[in-house]
């Protein structure tokens, strides 16, 4: 058991056959032993360019802001396709399930949002692609008027987020701007809100405009 635990630690993503080959035992035997040791098969992929030190520094920085009772506001963009094709359905065994797909329902609505805790502070909907000008306009007209005083605004390090007039608008309004470390979307909780919104839209068969009228999404 000790040798197997060491093997798992050294080769966490080895295939069962590879793990069995080293000590010369069967794959089935390795499988039983792993279950007895409460070791399960899973994997978390990490971007090869991600910097764990920078991620740690960012998390400590956010923790320090929270200790000062600063409001953390996470911002991000996402896209919502107009069509929501139902790729699977029910039919008697042995028979096909046929559906209808609107091949002309193309395009998407792009959204920019800001999140406080687990609730949206504001959302902007755009039929065009989001670029620096669009983001600047949303920041000035929508985000800044709604931010609590001395907020900490967090966004990813997309090039257009770093345009000087966007940075100036936020900091000159008395807020602090922080950028996520590269390749670290999991550190932005608004990503989970977008996933939740897309799941609800599919369940309730709503348009994007209807979806973002749901009051429970927002800060009250």
Where are these regions (language model features)?
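Short functional hotspots at interaction and active-site rims
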Residues: 1-220
């Amino acid at each position: 058991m000790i040798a197997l635990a060491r093997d798992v630690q050294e080769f966490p993503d080895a295939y069962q056959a590879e793990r069995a080959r080293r000590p010369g035992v069967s794959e089935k035997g390795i499988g039983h032993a792993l279950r007895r040791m409460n070791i399960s098969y899973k994997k978390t992929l990490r971007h090869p360019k991600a910097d764990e030190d920078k991620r740690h520094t960012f998390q400590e920085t956010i923790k320090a802001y929270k200790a000062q009772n600063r409001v953390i506001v996470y911002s991000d963009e996402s896209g919502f396709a107009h069509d929501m094709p139902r790729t699977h359905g029910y039919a008697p065994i042995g028979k096909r399930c046929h559906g209808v797909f609107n091949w002309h329902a193309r395009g998407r609505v792009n959204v920019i949002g800001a999140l406080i805790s687990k609730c949206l502070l504001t959302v902007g909907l755009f039929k065009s692609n989001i670029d620096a000008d669009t983001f600047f306009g949303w920041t000035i007209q929508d985000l800044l008027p709604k931010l609590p005083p001395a907020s900490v605004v967090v966004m990813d390090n997309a090039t257009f987020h770093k345009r000087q007039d966007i940075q100036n608008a936020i900091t000159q309004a008395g807020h602090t701007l922080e950028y996520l470390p590269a390749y670290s979307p999991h550190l932005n909780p608004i990503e989970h809100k977008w996933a939740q919104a897309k799941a609800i839209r599919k369940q309730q068969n709503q348009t994007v405009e209807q979806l973002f009228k749901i009051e429970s999404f927002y800060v009250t």
